[in-house]
């Protein structure tokens, strides 16, 4: 018999011949679609490690998958060759399912005046690190080539952000055996993904760290919180919904399920794991951050993204509206951010993190998944007992 010590009723004696049902089990039975989605994903727990381009690693994805969750590789800035290398590395470490994420984007052709103005704006910041800004050799990876690599690699899950696929592309991924997940920051975007045949929608609230995935309408209008976004998406589409944004522990997982989500995607929660790809300076910033230390900014990449406030964010705040759109600004600041990481300078790093950063835990990924699972089961029990 399992007791939940917070509930006084559970400590009272039972009449002979009676037994007390497991509240966690009872709640799970009330969420049958959760088990259905987990079966489709091929995982035991409703925990998905968020794809974090530049910060995740094959070791992180493999550890999460091996622990019963779903590990993800953020491939938005990986070349097709690097995508293949990363996928092979995951498969060498685990035979469990994993996913890969791409940015749906077109390669830009910015005018020279825009590029030159942006480089001049960044020159003082480069100078602080003893460097001069240089024009990048490419603005971004070619999405068409990345997509072909994704189809060939056949991960269990293919997820997308920044834009939307067409129905033919979704059909190709289905033929390759991939479950297609589309990121939505609004109800309209969730409906759009359902209409092109996506299997799952990831509803990403404004609390989430890193880049906003908005592709319909204005970024400002799309700043809907997870608590408001998830149930509206659940009601709007007939496909499963994954909740993302601000979820850091098992209580958040249970809360998301209570809203109708069938799993959660957690990025910031896994950033401090030793398997992640961030450097010492970034780790120190995470350890010191509080709940009020993040905000959305365009200064690093040209696309709104949530990160820990630092000197570069503040220095360019007045110029934010003039920053060229992603991926141009992202490419122009790339060398600066790499140099800052090498020099241990948090002042010039894009310290992507969500509003839950104050609750980050520096645990090995597999151990963190186990802790999250225990917390989730306990929270399910509390919800069942309160019902």
Regions found by a protein language model. Give the residues of each.
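Short, Lys/Arg-enriched N-terminal segments with co-localized hydrophobic residues
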Residues: 19-32
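Active-site entrance/lid segments in N-terminal catalytic domains of soluble metabolic enzymes
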Residues: 31-236, 372
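Conserved active-site-proximal phosphate/metal-binding subdomains
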Residues: 211-216, 220-242, 247-387
């Amino acid at each position: 018999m399992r007791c939940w010590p917070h509930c006084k009723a559970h400590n009272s004696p039972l009449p002979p011949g009676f037994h007390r049902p497991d509240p966690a089990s009872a709640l799970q039975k009330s969420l049958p679609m959760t088990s259905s989605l987990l079966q489709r994903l091929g995982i035991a727990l409703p925990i998905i490690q968020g794809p974090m381009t530049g910060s995740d690693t094959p070791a992180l994805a493999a550890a999460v998958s091996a622990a019963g969750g779903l590990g993800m590789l953020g491939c938005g800035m990986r070349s097709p060759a690097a995508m293949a290398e990363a996928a092979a590395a995951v498969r060498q470490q685990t035979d469990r399912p994993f996913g890969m994420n791409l940015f749906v984007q077109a390669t830009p052709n910015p005018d020279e005046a825009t590029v030159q103005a942006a480089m001049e704006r960044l020159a003082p910041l480069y100078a602080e690190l003893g460097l001069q800004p240089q024009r990048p050799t490419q603005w971004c990876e070619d999405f068409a080539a990345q997509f072909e690599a994704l189809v060939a690699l056949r991960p269990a899950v293919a997820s997308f952000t920044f834009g939307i696929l067409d129905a033919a592309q979704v059909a190709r991924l289905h033929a390759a055996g991939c479950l297609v997940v589309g990121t939505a920051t609004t109800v309209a975007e969730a409906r759009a993904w359902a209409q092109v045949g996506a299997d799952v929608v990831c509803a990403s609230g404004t609390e989430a760290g890193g880049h906003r995935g908005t592709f319909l309408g204005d970024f400002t209008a799309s700043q809907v919180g997870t608590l408001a976004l998830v149930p509206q998406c659940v009601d709007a589409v007939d496909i499963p919904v994954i909740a993302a944004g601000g979820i850091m522990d098992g209580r958040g997982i249970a809360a998301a399920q209570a809203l109708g989500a069938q799993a959660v995607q957690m990025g910031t929660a896994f950033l401090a794991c030793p398997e992640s790809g961030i450097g010492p300076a970034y780790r120190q910033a995470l350890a010191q951050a509080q709940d009020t230390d993040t905000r959305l900014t365009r200064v690093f990449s040209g696309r709104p993204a949530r990160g820990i406030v630092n000197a570069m964010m503040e220095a360019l705040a007045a110029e934010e509206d003039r920053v060229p759109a992603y991926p141009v600004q992202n490419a122009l600041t790339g060398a600066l951010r790499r140099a800052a990481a090498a020099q241990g300078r948090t002042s010039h790093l894009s310290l992507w993190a969500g509003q839950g950063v104050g609750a980050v835990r520096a645990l090995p990924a597999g151990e963190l998944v186990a802790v999250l699972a225990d917390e989730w089961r306990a929270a399910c029990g509390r919800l069942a007992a309160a019902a």
